């Protein structure tokens, strides 16, 4: 068995990186040009980023194109991730993806990263270019792109934990919501939680959310009522 695994590992290691990545096909008249996603054809992967404990099997890519150029070219950055939710402000783009690659946690008493969300930030302030900034992780899962915000250099997120209704557990944690604020650490390499309000609206699910200036607004759906929650996020 070990010999088979070693043999398969050798085959995988010998495959060029570009053979494993998506490509862009440009057609001009009858000519087709293939563009690689890596920085160069020799398998350079410097424009790819991945969480140290990533479980995602896909690639989320940000492509920047100049539609006025005579010759087709693009700037690209990539995250190895699960299916991502995208948010963008004027200067920052966020990709938020589940830290776990499956929604099914049956029998998993040690939840671990199942309800965690990875958030990857990119600088889009320069036209025609994207630059990876850093990533962070928050507790809970998000509803949609309106659950995300970038404001004054910080990332703001509303999330929910326990919404999967773990019916197989005898006494599961109740469903609650959270508002988290993330800021870059002193080295500028990781987004860390610098503010958090948790335990919000026990037993209720986020229906919609908005961040407006220093204010976070949230609606929950519970039976036939729609309570509205406001949180002031000034530091």
Predicted regions located by residue number:
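Beta-sheet-rich non-transmembrane sensory/scaffold domains
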Residues: 1-235
């Amino acid at each position: 068995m070990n010999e088979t695994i070693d043999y398969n590992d050798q085959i995988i290691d010998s495959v060029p990186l570009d053979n494993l990545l998506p490509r862009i096909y440009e057609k001009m008249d009858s000519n087709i040009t293939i563009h690689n996603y890596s920085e160069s054809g020799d398998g350079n992967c410097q424009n790819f980023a991945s969480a140290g404990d990533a479980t995602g099997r896909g690639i989320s890519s940000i492509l920047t194109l100049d539609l006025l150029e005579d010759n087709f070219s693009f700037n690209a950055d990539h995250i190895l991730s699960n299916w991502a939710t995208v948010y963008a402000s004027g200067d920052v783009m966020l990709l938020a993806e589940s830290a776990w690659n499956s929604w099914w946690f049956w029998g998993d008493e040690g939840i671990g990263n199942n309800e965690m969300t990875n958030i990857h930030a990119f600088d889009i302030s320069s036209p025609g270019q994207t630059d990876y900034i850093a990533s962070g992780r928050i507790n809970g899962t998000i509803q949609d792109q309106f659950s995300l915000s970038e404001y004054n250099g910080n990332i703001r997120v509303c999330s929910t934990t326990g919404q999967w209704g773990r019916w197989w557990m005898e006494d599961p944690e109740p469903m609650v919501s959270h508002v988290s604020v993330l800021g870059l650490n002193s080295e500028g390499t990781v987004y860390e939680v610098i503010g958090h309000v948790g335990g919000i609206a026990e037993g209720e699910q986020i229906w919609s959310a908005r961040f407006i200036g220093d204010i976070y607004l949230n609606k929950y759906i519970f039976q036939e009522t729609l309570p509205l929650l406001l949180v002031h996020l000034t530091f």
